[in-house]
C-alpha cells in the first residue's frame, strides 16, 4: 500500500509528466486559456490515461510478451489508445454535449497526446510493475496532468487581464509561466528517494 502511495505522489508531484518529463505539452499550451476547458480536458485525459494504462498492461503482459511479439508494442499501444479515446469521446458526447462541443478537436487529439503513449511505454519498461502499480502510475499521471493544466489555466486567466509588456504577450508569457511552474515543481524532487 505504501508503494502505491509513493507511485501516486511521484507521478503527480515529483516526476510530473508535463513539467519534469515534458510530455503532453501540446494540450498543456493549447487548452489552458480557460479553466472550464482545462478541467474538462483534464478529466477526459485522466480517464484515458488510467484506462490506457490498464489496457496496455494487459496487452503487454498477456499477449505480446507470451507470444514473443514485443516488437509490436508501440503499434499495439497506439491501437489500444485510439480505441480508448474513441470510447471516451462517445462517453463525453453522450453524457455532456456541452463539454463535447467546448473541447472540440482536442478530444480526438488525446490519441496523439504523447503523455498517453509515454505512460504506457514507461509502464511496459518497468518489469517490477504489476497491474496495480501500472494502474496507479496511469491514474497518477492523469492527476498530475490535471493539476498542472488547471493551475496553468488559472494563471493564464489572471495573466490575460494583467498589464503584460508588449514583447512578452502571447506565447512568450505562457512559456515563462510554464518555466516558473516547472521550477516550482522541482522543489518536490527530494520528496521521494529514487
Swiss-Prot record:
An example Gene Ontology biological process: electron transport chain
The keyword Acetylation is annotated on this UniProt entry: no
Annotated TM spans: 4-24, 39-59, 71-91, 102-122, 135-155, 172-192
Lipid bilayer topology: Multi-pass membrane protein
Top-level EC class as recorded in UniProt: translocase
Principal location listed in the UniProt entry: membrane
UniProt entry keywords in alphabetical sequence: Cell inner membrane, Cell membrane, Electron transport, Membrane, Translocase, Transmembrane, Transmembrane helix, Transport
Quaternary structure note: The complex is composed of six subunits: RnfA, RnfB, RnfC, RnfD, RnfE and RnfG.
Family (UniProt): Belongs to the NqrDE/RnfAE family.
Protein role: Part of a membrane-bound complex that couples electron transfer with translocation of ions across the membrane.
Protein name: Ion-translocating oxidoreductase complex subunit A
Organism of origin: Pseudomonas paraeruginosa (strain DSM 24068 / PA7)
Gene behind this protein: rnfA
